[in-house]
């Protein structure tokens, strides 16, 4: 089986930023799990994880928020979080002037 998802970088500040912008964009969002959390969840479900392939995915801010019909007040809150992000967070997510950013994703091969 293949599982593909956005993954948290794990480190507290970067994780908090990711979870915050995801929740503001989509109030039904639960959590972006780290690679370690995914591996543990799959193991608990009886899977043995083989290969894990990671990549970075650029998110166009306007498209990303439009897909979920994010209300304008929440779009502005996301922009405010991005503007206030630490250098470490801003660099990790490669936050651009228009709000676009890059996130981590992983593909898990499990049997």
Regions picked out by a protein language model, each given a short descriptive name:
Residues 2-29:
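Conserved class I S-adenosyl-L-methionine
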Residues 36-39, 43-111:
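Conserved Class I S-adenosyl-L-methionine
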Residues 1-2, 49:
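A short hydrophobic/small-residue beta-strand
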